[in-house]
Curated annotation (Swiss-Prot):
GO annotation, biological process: proteolysis
Signal peptide positions (record): none
Similarity section: Belongs to the peptidase S1 family. Snake venom subfamily.
Keyword match Hydrolase: yes
Molecular functions (GO terms): serine-type peptidase activity; toxin activity
Keyword annotations from UniProtKB, A to Z: Blood coagulation cascade activating toxin, Fibrinogenolytic toxin, Hemostasis impairing toxin, Hydrolase, Protease, Secreted, Serine protease, Toxin
Compartmental location: Secreted
Function: Thrombin-like snake venom serine protease that cleaves alpha-chain of fibrinogen (FGA) releases only fibrinopeptide A. Shows coagulant, esterase and amidase activities.
One GO CC annotation: extracellular region
Recorded superkingdom: Eukaryota
UniProt note on tissues of expression: Expressed by the venom gland.
EC numbers: 3.4.21.-
Native organism: Lachesis muta rhombeata (Bushmaster)
Name by which UniProt lists this protein: Thrombin-like enzyme LmrSP-3
Amino acid sequence: IVGGDECNINEHRFLVALYDPDGFFC
């Protein structure tokens, strides 16, 4: 999950960073 409206959600960004640091590009 990279880019798009999803990156505008802080909680989502945080969860993505924890789940897949290598895929955290927001």
